[in-house]
């Protein structure tokens, strides 16, 4: 069939659906890894649509919305021969076949914790690398599985983002922090009226994100709060009276608390 046509239709469909994570277990065989990378980048950068994809061997990904899964997984399957003996067959899951499982880990991991070292108990082994090779791979934005002596686990939960800029720093390399940032973007920014309650919700989410950065040693401290000076300047620039707690006043007559509570319109 027309694989390109199917992919185009799929991308068009998902542009109007709500989801966070995507995996396509035939994407490498179909020769469409780069197309999905470009599409995810476009959705994130141009449409503020914070989707993410787990893709196999997406070495040119370099995007916080792309997880570059690069390990083979193995599962031992036992069949009964009927003569008191069994045959154990080792089944290999290529990187592309493993992507749905990895996407499932990210989608199912609580926002308060990282997927780093998450166990994959449904597999019996993984493509093994020595620690130096693992560190090198992780440093180039590859997500790996590793064998800890007892079970298969995820290595450090990194995104494929590697080329840092003044705007995007090392925090974009960590899947957990990207999830936090996406949640702030998706759940709050531009979605709610700028009421005091909604501002408090946004500030709580951003401060939770900052706390993760502090815990990871990425920043020493960070807090978000309502900027009273900017908010007062904005209200005055509108040139209109403001109603706060049932009272209508000119912006310059508002107390600091009233400025904080005032609705400042949409984002």
Explain the meaning of each model-derived region.
Residues 101, 105-128, 132-267:
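Structured, hydrophobic secondary-structure cores that serve as assembly/anchoring elements
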């Amino acid at each position: 069939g027309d694989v390109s046509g199917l992919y185009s239709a799929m991308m068009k469909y998902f542009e109007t659906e709500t989801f966070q994570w995507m995996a396509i277990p035939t994407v490498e065989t179909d020769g469409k890894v780069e197309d999905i990378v470009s599409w995810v980048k476009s959705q994130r950068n141009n449409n503020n649509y914070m989707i993410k994809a787990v893709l196999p061997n997406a070495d040119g990904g370099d995007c916080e919305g792309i997880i570059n899964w690069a390990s083979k997984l193995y599962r031992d399957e036992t069949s009964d021969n009927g003569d008191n003996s069994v045959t154990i067959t080792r089944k290999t899951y290529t990187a592309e076949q493993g992507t749905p499982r990895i996407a499932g880990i990210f989608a199912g991991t609580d926002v308060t914790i990282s997927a780093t070292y998450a166990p994959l108990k449904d597999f019996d082994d993984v493509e093994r690398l020595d620690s130096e090779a693992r560190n090198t791979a992780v440093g180039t934005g590859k997500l790996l599985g590793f064998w800890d002596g007892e079970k298969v686990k995820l290595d450090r939960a990194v995104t494929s983002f590697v080329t840092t800029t003044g705007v995007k720093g090392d925090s974009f390399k960590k899947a957990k922090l990207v999830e936090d940032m996406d949640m702030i973007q998706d759940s709050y920014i531009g979605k709610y009226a700028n009421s005091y309650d909604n501002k408090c919700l946004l500030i709580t989410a951003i401060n939770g994100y900052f706390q993760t950065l502090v815990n990871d040693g990425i920043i020493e401290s960070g807090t978000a709060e309502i900027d009273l000076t900017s908010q007062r300047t904005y209200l005055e620039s509108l040139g209109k009276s403001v109603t706060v707690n049932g009272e209508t006043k000119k912006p310059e007559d508002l107390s600091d608390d009233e400025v904080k509570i005032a609705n400042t319109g949409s984002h």
